[in-house]
């Protein structure tokens, strides 16, 4: 009887796919930098380690040996780094719930045209290695934030921050031109990130922001405002019309996943974007 059990066990093992070779039913997901490092068998397990983790590094491999080699920093250079291919699970969806439009559009700012103050970026940015970006699936991850001291009071100072990862050459904190308000800063931080992405030929972007006003404005309210002649449901002029016009124009040709992250809640990317924005607010206006 013991011999039969041994034989049955050997047969069962032979029927299993070899984990050190090519798996017939999936791939191996290697995480070099994330919450936990190692090799995982599903994209969901991998994503749990790299989602919202700054400068995460991960790859998908056909064999376990290659996956572990990557974890040990000796992976084959032929495999592209940092993203899931078209057969993998899709990255996070856009904000699942769209809030209702506020009755007054934006109650914290006074209406004033802004377009004349804002200058589009015209300086071409040097190409940056794709390995320096963080990825969620095949989407590049970026964090944006805006700030304004004395918002709505005398002598406000606003800045925008864009954070791509630790020490990334595209990280930027600059003073917001024109009308100094917090919500304008939030919108134009997103504008800056998209401008930068386009200079790097990046057309898939996961953009994290703590501004639900920006997210709901660009994903939902803008269409209603346009149909209503850029007026709110209460019949008032949309205060940030020119800002959202600029943002919507930049999103053309881009696949952007708008993601909300709670502000000042310990998310490193958000904290760094906030730091950059505050540094930008200290700069003088050009």
Swiss-Prot record:
PROSITE patterns, alphabetized: RNASE_H_1
Record key words, sorted: Cytoplasm, Disease variant, Endonuclease, Hydrolase, Magnesium, Metal-binding, Nuclease, Primary mitochondrial disease, Progressive external ophthalmoplegia
Keyword Glycoprotein part of the UniProt annotation: no
SUPFAM superfamilies, alphabetized: L9 N-domain-like, Ribonuclease H-like
Biased composition (Basic and acidic residues): 101-115
Known cofactor(s): Mg(2+)
Entries under CDD domains matching the protein: RNase_HI_eukaryote_like (cd09280)
Alphabetical GO biological process terms: DNA replication, removal of RNA primer; RNA catabolic process
Catalytic activities: Endonucleolytic cleavage to 5'-phosphomonoester
GO MF entries: magnesium ion binding; nucleic acid binding; RNA binding; RNA nuclease activity; RNA-DNA hybrid ribonuclease activity
All residue ranges annotated as the RNase H type-1 domain in the record: 136-282
Cofactor binding summary note: Binds 1 Mg(2+) ion per subunit. May bind a second metal ion at a regulatory site, or after substrate binding.
Binding positions for Mg(2+) 2 per the UniProt entry: 145, 274
Disulfide bonds listed in the record: none
Regulation of this protein's activity per its record: In the presence of magnesium, manganese is inhibitory.
Annotated Mg(2+) 1 binding sites: 145, 186, 210
Oligomeric and partner information: Monomer.
Disease implicated: Progressive external ophthalmoplegia with mitochondrial DNA deletions, autosomal recessive 2: A form of progressive external ophthalmoplegia, a mitochondrial myopathy characterized by progressive paralysis of the levator palpebrae, orbicularis oculi, and extraocular muscles. PEOB2 patients manifest exercise intolerance, muscle weakness, and signs and symptoms of spinocerebellar ataxia, such as impaired gait and dysarthria. Some patients may have respiratory insufficiency.
Similarity field: Belongs to the RNase H family.
Official protein name in the record: Ribonuclease H1
Organism: Homo sapiens
Lineage: Eukaryota, Metazoa, Chordata, Craniata, Vertebrata
Gene from which the chain derives: RNASEH1
């Amino acid at each position: 009887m013991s011999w039969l059990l041994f034989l049955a066990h050997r047969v069962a093992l032979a029927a299993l796919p070899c984990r050190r070779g090519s798996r017939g039913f999936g791939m191996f997901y290697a995480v070099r930098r994330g919450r936990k490092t190692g090799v995982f068998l599903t994209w969901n397990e991998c994503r749990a380690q790299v989602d919202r983790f700054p400068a995460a590094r991960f790859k998908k491999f056909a064999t376990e040996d290659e996956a572990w080699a990557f974890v040990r920093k000796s992976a084959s250079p032929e495999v592209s780094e940092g993203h899931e291919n078209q057969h993998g699970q899709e990255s996070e969806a856009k904000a699942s719930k769209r809030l209702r439009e506020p009755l007054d559009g934006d109650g914290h700012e006074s209406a004033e045209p802004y377009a004349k103050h804002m200058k589009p970026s015209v300086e071409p940015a040097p190409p940056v290695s794709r390995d320096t970006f963080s990825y969620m699936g095949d989407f590049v991850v970026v964090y944006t934030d805006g700030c304004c001291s004395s918002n709505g009071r005398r002598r406000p100072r606003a800045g925008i921050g864009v954070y791509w990862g630790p020490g990334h050459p595209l990280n930027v904190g600059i003073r917001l031109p024109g009308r100094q308000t917090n919500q304008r800063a939030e919108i134009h931080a997103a504008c800056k990130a998209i401008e930068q992405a386009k200079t790097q030929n990046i057309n898939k972007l996961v953009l994290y922001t703590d501004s639900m006003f920006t997210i709901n404005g660009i994903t939902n309210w803008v269409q209603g405002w346009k149909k209503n002649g850029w007026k709110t449901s209460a019949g008032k002029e949309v205060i940030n019309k020119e800002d959202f016009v600029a943002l919507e124009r930049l999103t053309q040709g881009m696949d952007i996943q708008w993601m909300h992250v709670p502000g000042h809640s310990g998310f490193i990317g958000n904290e760094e974007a906030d730091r950059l924005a505050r540094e930008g607010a200290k700069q003088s206006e050009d």
